Structures are given as structure tokens and as C-alpha cells.
Amino acid sequence: MREIELNPLDEHMARKMADLAGVTPGTSFFQAVRLVCFAAANGHVCLDLRDYAGQEMSFNYLGSMETIPLPEIDLWIDELASNPLVGDGTNNTPFVLDNKHSRLYLHRYWQYERHLITAFKHLSAAQLNVSTTQADMVKHLFADTSSSEEQQQATQMAGQSQLCIITGGPGTGKTTTIVSIMAMLLTENPEIKIILTAPTGKAAARSEE
């Protein structure tokens, strides 16, 4: 059995939305609102209903425990889709249901994701004027290192697009690759302005090395 500790905001939001929808606390809609608020408070853009569907949940609110069985995924989605406060994003409803991926969003977070997707598509479609010497520059940057071919490819790709996503596990050379990208960009344009951001203190420390 999974246990979730709710804060007063989660509970108040769920009760307020249940009241607006004309349903009683304890319904599957009520539990979904609890969970999507809990997910947002913990840094998630949405609630993946598949992570909870068909499970027995224990909600802890101010020390009071409540055990609730949640519906199976298909039934849960049907119940949410029929609720007047849940839409598909075309109307201004408090919640947005993504039927295809079984995800429930607070409308504001759904808008954030749409805006980010639009920005990514725009950036990825943009064509850059690539320097004819860029390939030689990348080889020079990695000449005295034990870098992998993938790192060199990532560096070169970063110079060819306005959007480049680099992934890898610990110790795979992501930071080294980023340093090489910056060196390449600065070599091409010493006046370029580079802004670095990091999601965690550890990542920030690595970026400063």
C-alpha cells in the first residue's frame, strides 16, 4: 500500500474542486485532484494516472489516515473525462486530461508544457550558418583528450543547431562536452554571451569547475 502525506493546500484544493463539480469528497475525481496537486507540489508537471490506477492508497492528512482503493485506469479516465472541470485543453477548465498518455494536468502546467514544446520545435527547425572550419575546430579541441566519438559528435551538433539535448549517466563526460561546446563557440565568436543554469547545487558546482 502506498502512502502520501497531503498538505493543507492539496486537501483544500480537492475539496473546493469537488464542491464546484458537484461531487462528494471520496470520489475518484476528488482523489485525482489530491494527487495532481501533490505531484505539482513535488516538482512534477502532471500526474501519470497509470502510476496509481488500481492501487490502494493511504492518504495522511494532518495525522488522519484514510485508505482509498483507486479505480482501474480505463474507468478512471472515463470518470475524469465526464467531469465538467476536466477538459482537453481547448476550453478553460481547471484540469486538462491527456487521454493518449493517461496524464492529468493542472491547466497552468499544461500550458507551460505546450509553450515549451512550441519553443523547442521552433528552435529545432532553425538553421544555422555553420562555419566550414567547425569540424577541424572540434578535432583540435579533443586532440589531447581521451574523449569518446559521441562527445565529439555532440559538440559538433551543438554548433549546428539552436537546440541540442545531451544526455548520459554519471561519468560519461557531459560536463567535459559542455566545456568543449563553450570553447568552440568562443573561438568562433569571442564576444558571444553564454548563460549557464543548473538544476541542483551539485550540477552548479560542476559547472563552475
Give short role names for the model-derived ranges.
Residues 1-208:
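Conserved ATP-binding/catalytic motifs of P-loop helicase motor domains
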